[in-house]
């Protein structure tokens, strides 16, 4: 008698979180956004110029981050959005995800001199 109740409770525990609504970015073509978490949720601030690709949006966000740091800011990690994808600019590179809470995938890495490049684009030095 208890087994069906336990199974029902376990099934509800797995199904209910899957039904929760995930935060998704705007899908406006060519629009690049800086995303700022607030107490009320996420605030999407559109960057002034249209960007042709996710990589260009990431570069525009990186330039914005560097400008703010040069003006005395202290925020080293920022988030953005481009055509239904979130961008997360962190020290290792730039990650992308289709939702704020979802899994993040590496889109661009930092080269030895700090530039952003596609993973595997930089030649590896030969092993000694």
Which functions belong to the PLM regions below?
Residues 20-128:
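Mitochondrial intermembrane space
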Residues 1-8:
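Bacterial N-terminal signal peptides that target proteins for export
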């Amino acid at each position: 008698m208890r087994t069906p109740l336990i199974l029902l409770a376990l099934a509800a525990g797995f199904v209910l979180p899957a039904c929760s609504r995930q935060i998704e970015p705007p899908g406006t073509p060519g629009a690049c956004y800086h995303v700022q978490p607030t107490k009320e949720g996420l605030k999407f601030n559109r960057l002034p110029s249209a960007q042709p690709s996710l990589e260009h949006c990431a570069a525009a966000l990186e330039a914005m981050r560097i400008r703010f740091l040069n003006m005395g800011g202290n925020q080293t990690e920022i988030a953005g959005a481009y055509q239904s994808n979130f961008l997360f600019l962190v020290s290792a590179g730039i990650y992308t995800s289709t939702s704020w809470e979802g899994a993040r995938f590496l889109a661009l890495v930092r080269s030895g001199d700090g530039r952003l490049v596609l993973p595997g684009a930089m030649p590896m030095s030969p092993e000694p």
